[in-house]
């Protein structure tokens, strides 16, 4: 990616190096909880990556609920300040990519209000409860912020064999896609539909939410430009994103973790669906094409 010399977003918080504790973390039965323990048991700690994002997004709005999860807490939460552990290279990638999404979506949507990205290590306070790195990157609609533990990118490269700067940019753009859905009321509508749906139907709704976010990521990638007007992506970059989308498909992860594929349990889409959604956005370059 052509990141050198590009402007950085100021909508960025560096909480890396802080020691945080949340007493409302894992609990049970609360309607605001996500299905994090269930997903962990299926895919393993540190192996959830983008899968949990959909759970957290919808359930922080009071969606599916479940056996427990990251819950809002009225008990004290604390953070001890420490020296940042964020490398200059990763910080620049995060802020430049975020800045370019602001540039594109600001023009495409007109009244776009940028999200803020928070980099943290281990765990951090959010308006959706206490966020933990095991959940992978996530978007909290209550504070309209994206949360990323930078160690996730090492996991993406090593465990899922999806290295590269655009693989990382795809993750960021996917979360920005959830922010757009929130601004446009799509998450609220999905939540309302889930409240009337069966578990299987609710999963299908969630898949459509995630595929749309993938498509939005592709739309941004197609339109991303440097300050000089060149495409931000270089040769081979888009393929990095496609490899990442393939690696985190529900069917691929289920095969790896449990040896069988259960389509009714999909919450983010198969590898083929995720790749097709990213490709649709990239090929059309048009947000209107991202209807699922």
Predicted segment positions?
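Short pre-active-site segment immediately N-terminal to the catalytic Zn-binding motif
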Residues: 152-170, 201-207
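Active-site recognition of the HExxH zinc-binding catalytic motif
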Residues: 105, 148, 167-183, 213-214, ...
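Pan-zinc metallopeptidase signature
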Residues: 248-292
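Post-HExxH zinc-binding segment in Zn-dependent metallohydrolases
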Residues: 1-22, 199-228
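Short helix/loop segments within enzyme catalytic domains
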Residues: 88, 92-117, 204, 208-253
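Long amphipathic alpha-helical segments used for membrane anchoring, targeting, substrate engagement
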Residues: 1-81
